[in-house]
């Protein structure tokens, strides 16, 4: 599986797929395949590959499939949420018109990573929100 991850990092997607196929029963293979399909732009297959995984990547696949309820549940279940987790929760909140959650999650993200403020200020996801004063 590690060979597949290295090949994927080097944008050798055919080689990555072959290596992942050889590691079909390896721990973490579903997560790796999910990332593979995300990079290929096959978001539906990515979401299926992640299965019940509770990770930022799994939530990203769900967001890109417009399954915001599943993405919210996944993000809430992430074991060690980080700035990206909260930023993604803010994206879900923006896409579901939950203004209070947008601000609450962006504040949590910015508390963990101050650069989030600058990112949110130019992110079209938050164009309808005043994120300048996080």
Residue ranges and their predicted role:
Residues 2, 32, 57, 88, ...:
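Canonical tetratricopeptide repeat
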Residues 5, 35, 59-60, 91:
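Residue-level recognition of tetratricopeptide repeat
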Residues 28-32, 53, 60, 84, ...:
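Start-of-helix register in tetratricopeptide repeats
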